[in-house]
Amino acid sequence: MFSFFTVKAKNTKEKVLLEIDELEKVLKLSKKLTNKQIGRLAKYLRKHPPAERYNLISADIQQALATDETIPSDFNVESIQVEMMIANFRAREMVSREKSKKVGITHVSIVFQPEFEYCETAQKYRKKYDGKVVKLRDAPIFPLMTCYNCNNCTRFVHVKRLVRGIDY
């Protein structure tokens, strides 16, 4: 009955590739680098994924940026920490959803913390989804892509997997 707690972790390389894709999308939205620079960064990271780790760290990005002569040498990797965090959270959520689908979980409940203020975009999602049961495939992935300036969306939205017959 509770076999979904023993699902094996997905291939770490696949998770890292998802994270690279998400980082590429978020960086394009943030406009901190040009599309050409972002493309080179993503290409380098795909070619040289981090070994023995399940996510990207600043050193990986720094090494990739060092290979691109179009990026100023004084570019600080710390300036894209938020984008890296969002990419990591989104990739982790995608892997988690894939595991949930494999074990038959089809519905989730999205809970926003009432004591926090959310950005305008997240407020719309809050009105639509807060506390409601939604199909897993229809639920948005938090943090939203547009919320790279909003810390509340990355930390204070909880997506709970629901088991039919127990939770709903």
Q: Which stretches of residues belong to each language-model region?
A:
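Domain-core detector
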Residues: 1-151, 159-168
